[in-house]
């Protein structure tokens, strides 16, 4: 059972490459709650991105394929406080952008220490 009294907050801004780019990996002995996962297009052209989830020890499963972000779109929300996403130790999220460094992933995570994991 995670220790719910001790939480570490992690925020990351990750430019997606044109090949698989790690967005977030849940550390050993932790349970994580993705409170926000959003994507932004900073280019002057429409862009797409893929989002994959890999369970610890498993193979990547694509969650979104060629998801479009139009030009001048501020942010596209995938997970937020009303729709969190739970991860276990070793689970990972990764993404691929249609053009290197033009699609930006923004992630906010609560990490809970779990000595039994």
Residue ranges of predicted features:
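C-terminal interaction-tip segments
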Residues: 1-32, 36, 97-117
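A generic structural signal for short beta-strands and their flanking turns/coil linkers
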Residues: 33-35, 45-47, 89-91
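Short solvent-exposed strand-capping/beta-turn motif centered on an Asx-Ser/Thr pair
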Residues: 39-44, 98
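Acidic glycine-/aspartate-rich tracts in secreted/extracellular proteins
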Residues: 42-45, 56-58
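Beta-strand signatures of extracellular beta-sandwich domains
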Residues: 50-54, 106-108
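Intrinsically disordered, low-complexity Pro/Gly/Ser/Thr-rich segments with frequent PxxP/GP/PP motifs
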Residues: 58-92
